Amino acid sequence: MNKNQEAISVRLLTADLTDWVLKDFINQYKTTLKEVVVLPSAIRRAKILAQGSSLQIGAVIDYPLAQGTLAKVAFEIGRAFMEGADFLEVWLPASSFMENDRGFAELTETIRSLTLTGGEIRLAVQNEIMNELTKIQVAQRLKEEAWPKIVLGQKQPLAEALHDVSLFSLDGGSQLSIQINPDTVDEQALQSLQAAGAEKIGLSYHVFEELLKDQPSPDVL
């Protein structure tokens, strides 16, 4: 895997993902990929398949709708860490970032406290449905709270992904590590996203395997 591809986080999130596909994918790439993201129901199985490697297993919380209460989200976070997740993406509505200062501070404090029982938590937002002003406000709230990691979008068109990475990189603070999830990507796009400020690029396993087909040698991994 080349340097650009080391930033890739593969997303195995389709509801119809079979155990056979999960097993085949993890067995094939567990010694070369750094991380994969699965649904909560697949955490334990993915951890078993990843044994003997350094592959990190992440999971999504309140995905894709981001409509759960804080109590429900907190419960799901705790359960996911108990199942063995190394990191979590916690999907939040834009309204969560628009709360009064105390409300958002309490939210981030609660989520931070849950990391003490498990691993890393990355906030995730549906920036693809936000207007420009809301994106700026969300980025600024992340900066105010010194939040370290954000995941942006779900299968976002590349041009929009580049724009939003640049925006959050500019307004979210120097502490913010950004992951973007574009709908498609090639080597040039990987370089452009990273140059714009993305530290991780989330790809579906279909897009990831298409990317590998474009490599000059079959043993690129």
Residue ranges and their predicted role:
Residues K3-A15, K34-V38, L55-Y63, D86-V90, ...:
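Hydrophobic faces of well-ordered beta-strands that scaffold small-molecule active sites
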Residues S53, L116, Q137-W147:
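Short, electropositive alpha-helical surface patch
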Residues V38-Q56, Q67-F75, S95-T115, I129-K135, ...:
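Active-site-adjacent beta->alpha loops and helix N-cap segments on the catalytic face
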Residues M1-A7, L13-W20, K30-L33, M98-G103, ...:
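Generic structural signal for short, solvent-exposed loop/turn connectors between secondary structure elements
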Residues A59-P64, M82-F97, E144-E160, D183-V185, ...:
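Glycine-rich phosphate-binding active-site loops on the catalytic face of alpha/beta enzymes
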Residues F25-Y29, A80-E83, I111-L114, R141-E145, ...:
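Generic structural signal for hydrophobic
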Residues F97, I121-Q140, I178-L203:
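Electropositive, surface-exposed helix/loop patches at the edges of structured domains
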Residues M1-M82, R141:
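Conserved N-terminal beta1-alpha1 strand-loop-helix module at the mouth
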